[in-house]
Regions:
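Sec-dependent N-terminal signal peptides
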Residues: 5-14
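N-terminal non-catalytic regions of secreted/periplasmic and cell-surface proteins
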Residues: 17-64, 120-139
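Extended, solvent-exposed segments with strong compositional bias
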Residues: 59-96
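Surface-exposed, short loops/turns at beta-strand junctions within beta-sandwich domains
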Residues: 98-104
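Short beta-strand segments enriched for Tyr within beta-sheet-rich domains
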Residues: 105-109
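Short acidic/polar inter-strand loop motif in beta-rich domains
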Residues: 113-120
Length: 139
């Protein structure tokens, strides 16, 4: 019985530590088709830029409600400026080459800082190429 109590306490402690180590941050997307599409990252508001991004992926929502990677980059160095779609920042490595973004589809930008932090922005483009933002469909 004592072993079970200790095991449960250890599991609860591990869960609390894991929750404390994970956190989210803000990812803002801007731009339009035919022009630059930029992604900026902030700690908790638009006043404190976050530069310790280690990975960034843009994915498309498929017809069977899954995500397919359209572009993916990785680094251990961090950012000095916003990420522009299809342009690999200095110090980053392209894992998957960028594919063309088209109107009428749902996309998501996923970012990780390498120490438990993550962010996601869901977006699309209307017929004239204007970026529109979506409320995380089918998550």
């Amino acid at each position: 019985m004592l072993v079970r109590i200790v095991a449960v306490m250890l599991l609860l402690s591990a869960g609390i530590v894991a929750e404390a180590m994970s956190h989210s941050f803000v990812c803002k997307a801007s731009g339009r088709l035919g022009g630059p599409i930029r992604f900026e990252f902030y700690r908790n508001s638009s006043t404190h830029p976050k530069t310790d991004i280690e990975s960034f992926t843009v994915s498309i929502r498929t017809a069977d409600d899954r995500w397919k990677t359209m572009w993916s980059i990785f680094s251990h160095r961090g950012l000095t400026e916003p990420i522009e779609y299809g342009v690999t920042p200095p110090g980053f490595t392209t894992m998957i080459k960028p594919q063309k973004l088209i109107p009428g589809h749902v996309y998501a930008g996923f970012a990780s800082d390498g120490h438990g932090g993550s962010s996601k922005v869901t977006f699309g483009f209307d017929k004239d190429g204007t970026m529109i933002f979506l409320d995380n469909p089918l998550d």
